[in-house]
Amino acid sequence: MEPVPPTPQHQWIKQLVGEWTITGTCTMPDGSTGESKATESAHMVGDYFLHAVLKGKVPGMDVPVECVLIIGFDPDANNFVGTWIGSPMPNLINYTGSLSEDQTTLTLTCDAPDLEDQAKTSAYRDVIVITSDSTREFHSEIQLEDGSWNRFMSSYYTRSETPPPS
């Protein structure tokens, strides 16, 4: 099998590599809000996949949380792909996604258990916005019954260590 050269989308993923500090807010199902602080360590697995590990606490609680995010690009399907797991829940989340025309925003979509009723499934989108070489945002939204999107989590990332050149 011939090696597949990395695509521009694989190159885009590399800007997420590094050590990050994170501050965020989350709106709970009861309407209350919680703040959180965390760290993320992200590296490439070969030329194709990002492996990121977030460690912090559940917003508004003193409960440790660890999450693992994998992001890649599937050239055959012509879309971004990924998975997410987190210690607060037993579900493996599978993403598909696309990059904005201006190359600043990656939108990952998935179906996952509803925030309020775990027996139901809801549509979600997680949005990564590159704001500079050393900052980015991550927003999570759930699709409501009327088709609109409700943002329930926003996180702000600051690079705490420059990644090595790729």
Give the residues covered by each predicted segment:
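Hydrophobic small-molecule pocket/channel-lining residues, especially in calycin-type beta-barrels
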Residues: 1-166
